């Protein structure tokens, strides 16, 4: 998502990240040496993050665990990782005044949506549905 989430006139970037993600300041998120690919090339294990980047500089400003967590891959409707790796994102004015962003995971069998606020340099989980 690229949007001005805090109303300062400059867009932030909010996206799913993983171990080894490097920002514009060469700061690495998580473990730079991790490789969670299975024999088929799928990543069905390991940490996932949500990171907010400064849209002007590309530097990470906040990182938290991605919600909802992957958990049991089969609970999403298949066992090979297709449905657990279906993602969506949207902007919503949940308070009627300021933008929040929605992240989502899942397809068909199980859908989960999560709302986040970026306020005063802080990433806050609003709700999970």
What function would you assign to each model-found segment?
Residues 1-129:
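Beta-propeller-forming repeat regions
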